[in-house]
């Protein structure tokens, strides 16, 4: 090319790029209870990650890994690691994945939590709230 440009060349701008500035963050400790590695991509709704991954799923509602786009974190069987999550941006909707949310990640999340528990997803979070109808209450 006569103008000095190279096809596909990336010419970075000056300065520093700050990722996810101003977004809520949290950390969760994740253990892989499965017998195979599990890899979670940068923009996957972490609440719905592989059922063999055990962590506080309610803390991960509306969150994704705080890593650069197009990258992933791999969880080996039997290993445990702490990861940083960041809130999902845009319209804050999650569709597909494991079918636990299929809509907004804001507001009432009780149905998604019930589906997660019924499907046997690993969860270290709080137990389901007591409905007050136990034998000891009677």
From Swiss-Prot:
Gene Ontology terms: cellular component: urease complex
Keyword Iron-sulfur appears in the UniProt entry: no
Biased composition (Acidic residues): 128-138
Region Disordered, residue ranges: 115-138
Pfam families found in the cross-reference section: Urease_beta
Location relative to the cell: Cytoplasm
Reaction catalysis annotation: urea + 2 H2O + H(+) = hydrogencarbonate + 2 NH4(+)
A GO molecular-function annotation: urease activity
Listed EC numbers: 3.5.1.5
Family: Belongs to the urease beta subunit family.
Subunit (UniProt): Heterotrimer of UreA (gamma), UreB (beta) and UreC (alpha) subunits. Three heterotrimers associate to form the active enzyme.
Protein name according to UniProt: Urease subunit beta
Origin species: Haloarcula marismortui (strain ATCC 43049 / DSM 3752 / JCM 8966 / VKM B-1809)
Lineage of origin: Archaea, Methanobacteriati, Methanobacteriota, Stenosarchaea group, Halobacteria
């Amino acid at each position: 090319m006569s103008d000095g440009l190279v096809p596909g060349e990336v010419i970075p701008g000056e300065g520093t790029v700050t990722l996810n500035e101003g977004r809520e963050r949290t950390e969760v400790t994740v253990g892989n209870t499965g017998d195979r590695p599990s890899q979670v991509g940068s923009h996957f709704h972490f609440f719905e990650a592989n059922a063999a991954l055990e962590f506080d799923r309610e803390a991960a509602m509306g969150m994704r890994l705080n890593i650069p786009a197009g990258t992933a974190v791999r969880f080996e069987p039997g290993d445990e690691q702490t990861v940083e999550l960041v809130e999902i941006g845009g319209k804050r909707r999650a569709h597909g994945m494991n079918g636990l949310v299929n809509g907004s990640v804001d507001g009432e999340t009780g149905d998604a939590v019930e589906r997660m528990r019924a499907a046997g997803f690993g969860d270290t979070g709080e137990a389901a709230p007591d409905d007050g109808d136990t034998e000891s209450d009677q």
